[in-house]
Regions:
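Alpha-helical segment of the N-proximal tetratricopeptide repeat
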Residues: 5-41, 47, 54
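Terminal, low-structured helical/coil segments at or just beyond the last alpha-helical repeat
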Residues: 1-4, 120, 124-160
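Structural signature of alpha-solenoid helical repeat scaffolds
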Residues: 3-4, 36-37, 70, 106, ...
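TPR alpha-solenoid repeat register
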Residues: 44-45, 78, 112-114, 148
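Structural signature of tandem alpha-helical TPR/SEL1-like repeats
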Residues: 21-33, 54-67, 89-104, 113, ...
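Short coil turns that delineate tetratricopeptide repeat
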Residues: 39-40, 73, 107-109, 143
Length: 160
């Protein structure tokens, strides 16, 4: 694979991301696919999965995350994304190992997301103590995370 293909793939990825941010998800997906054909990266597979999820194609999103992990197992985002998609599907217990893998991934930003998602699992299970622990951990990592702050406030209000 030459540097030309890599550069072309990177350009397609950037265009895909711009399309996605503009809400043109089908166009974004097409560009991610083209980028992957030229030079597959964990990022491109993960972002294609993200586009599929917004289009309601959650199973395809999960499949892309598995492909991302195969390309680069150190990239943490697809682990968290699989966990989030499983939560979305109501498969909370299946989400936990994926979220824990995201927490320990070598290359992952933003680090607070798997903690926030694990808190969602604990809230679903009505395990208030573990939910509080994960929400507090989320806020240690990302003090400005409003969803965690709001959820922690709601949780603590239940016991006051």
């Amino acid at each position: 694979m030459g540097s030309d293909e890599r550069e072309q793939a990177a350009g397609l990825f950037q265009r895909a991301y711009a399309e996605q941010m503009a809400g043109r998800l089908e166009a974004a997906a097409e560009l991610y696919v083209k980028s992957i054909r030229l030079h597959p990266t964990a990022e491109a597979h993960t972002f294609l999965g993200w586009a599929w999820s917004f289009l309601g194609r959650v199973d395809d999103a999960i499949a892309e995350c598995h492909k991302a992990i195969a390309v680069d197992p150190d990239f943490g985002n697809p682990y968290n994304d699989i966990g989030a998609y499983l939560i979305e599907l109501g498969r909370h217990d299946e989400a936990v190992p994926w979220l824990k893998k995201a927490m320990t991934a070598v290359r992952y930003e933003p680090r607070h997301y798997p903690h926030l998602n694990l808190a969602r699992v604990h809230l679903h299970r009505l395990d208030w103590a573990l939910a509080e622990q994960e929400l507090r951990r989320t806020l240690e990592i990302a003090p400005d995370c409003e969803p965690a702050r709001r959820e922690l406030g709601r949780l603590l209000a239940k016991f006051n």
